[in-house]
Structures are given as structure tokens and as C-alpha cells.
Amino acid sequence: MTKAVLTSISQLALKALLYEVSLSPKPGLVDRFDNGAHDDMSFMTFIDSMIALSPFFQAYIETGFAYAKEEPLLLFNRLRQLGQKAEETMFCATQGINTHKGLNFSMALLLGATGAYLARTPHLMTDLGCFSKEDTLAICRLVKPMTAHLIQTDLGHLNTKKEFTYGEQLFVTYGIKGPRGEASEGFTTLTDHALPYFRQMISQNDPETSQLRLLVYLMSIVEDGNLIHRGGIEAWKGVKADMRLLLQQDLSTTDLRLALSSYNQCLINQHLSPGGAADLLALTFYFAFLEKLL
């Protein structure tokens, strides 16, 4: 019974990744229509990556459930070790292409926290149908003590390094904390912005329109390390401003799709891809499935 419930939730995480890549059109991003601003990956690359990561999603939630009483830092270390193995498996499946590195990190923490939370709330194990937005908030809050050390430990001593990872370079150059920062704050962009917005949208619109509007909203607010890495601060600010204007127009679904298709070509021409917004889109979908919004 327990394993079946945990398996079903891990499959929601996989489903969230599938929904994210399948949503189309997504400016600058890989979707069903084209590869966006990416010349090294395609829709099929993402499928390969998801299949590789799927067993680890199961392992993350089972680890959280099994070690729910453990100190948060110890649970984090277990999840990180699993996450590193997952990352290696992903890179093997994609022939070295980074499709989901940041999202895998976030999913490891949130699935681990989901498992730990379920171990403490046995009524949900027998009736996931009563999962609420309060449960979502509680799960995200569990991540905070697990990752409170992360910025100092991972990014606090970079002055001694000669070579940086992509995320480290963003922190050194711009002070962007990326997924580490989001996690260490308890995923507040998710709980305070993305999910409330999506709950409102889905109550007023069909699922596809709601998902597209959510993407635009996220592109208008997210501190997107991928955009900044590719185009700098001004390019990122420009995308945010463009998306704010698009939101204000309150377009029909047909016109919104046309606008996003046009903007896709604009970002392709600038080699810009809002990968940070895409990751938060997938995380929003995960909790939307748990809350039965989708």
C-alpha cells in the first residue's frame, strides 16, 4: 500500500516534466513544435532524460518517507547523493546534454520532502484526495531547514576556485543563487506566486490557457539564471518587461498562442531561453496534480 502511494506520487513528478516539455508554444524553449533557442537538444532529448530520471524520482520520495525522523541535513545529504547519481544517469542518456540538471535538484528536495511529510501525516497516505494547498506549503517549508546551509557551503568559498560550474559563475558574476537559493528559501516563488496565480487561472480558464498564462507570468517574475547566462541582465529584464506587457493585454487563447509563437522567434534570434521559468512551470504542475487542479 505504502509503496503504491509513493510510486503514484513519483509518477506525478514525471508527469509534470512531460506536461512542461509538451506545452507549446514556449518562447525560446524546447516544445512539441521546435527546439527553441537550443541547437543541442530536442523534444526527444527531453523524453530520454525523463526516462532516465524516473527511477530516481521514486527513490527520492521513498528516501524521504524512510528517513522522515532524521535530521534535515542528513536527509539532504542522502537526497543529494541520489541526485548526483541521477544527474550522471541523465547525462549518459542525453549524451552529455543538460536537460534537467537544475530541475532534478529541485525535484529531489521536493519529492524527499513530500515523502517525509507523508510519513508524518498518515491520513494522506490513505486518502490523497484530501491533499490541499496547506499541504503544499508544509512540504515546501520542510525543504528550508534541509538547505539552510547550502548557499554558504556551496557558494561561500568560490574565491578559492579557479574553474566554476554554470551556477557558480552566475553567483560570482551576478549574485544569482539559482535553484540553491530557491530551495534555501523554501521555494517561495512557487508557494507565494506561481501556485496562487495558477489556482486563480485554472478556476477561470481551460487547462491549456491556464498553463500558457502561467508560463508568461513566470517569465515576467522569475530571476532566470538561464536567460542571464545567455544574454546578461539587460536581456533578462527585457524579457520580463515584454511578458508583463503580454499579460496586461489579456489575450484570447488563440491570440496568446500567436503572440508566443512570434516571441519564440524573437528569443531564438537572440539565443535566449527562459530555463528558470520552465523549471518552475514543472514544479507548479507537480503540486497542481497533487492538489487536483489538473
From Swiss-Prot:
Q: Name one GO biological process term.
A: prosthetic group biosynthetic process
Key word ATP-binding present: yes
Q: Tell whether Nucleotide-binding is among the UniProt keywords.
A: yes
Q: Name one Pfam family in it.
A: CitG
- Coiled-coil stretches noted in the UniProt entry, renumbered to this chain: none
The terms under GO molecular function for this entry are: ATP binding; triphosphoribosyl-dephospho-CoA synthase activity
Tell me which EC number(s) this protein carries.
2.4.2.52
Signal peptide location in the record? Answer: none
Question: What reactions does this protein catalyze?
Answer: 3'-dephospho-CoA + ATP = 2'-(5''-triphospho-alpha-D-ribosyl)-3'-dephospho-CoA + adenine
Q: Which residues cross the membrane?
A: none
Q: Which UniProt keywords apply?
A: ATP-binding, Nucleotide-binding, Transferase
- Family recorded in the similarity comment: Belongs to the CitG/MdcB family.
This protein is called Probable 2-(5''-triphosphoribosyl)-3'-dephosphocoenzyme-A synthase
Write down the species: Streptococcus pyogenes serotype M28 (strain MGAS6180)
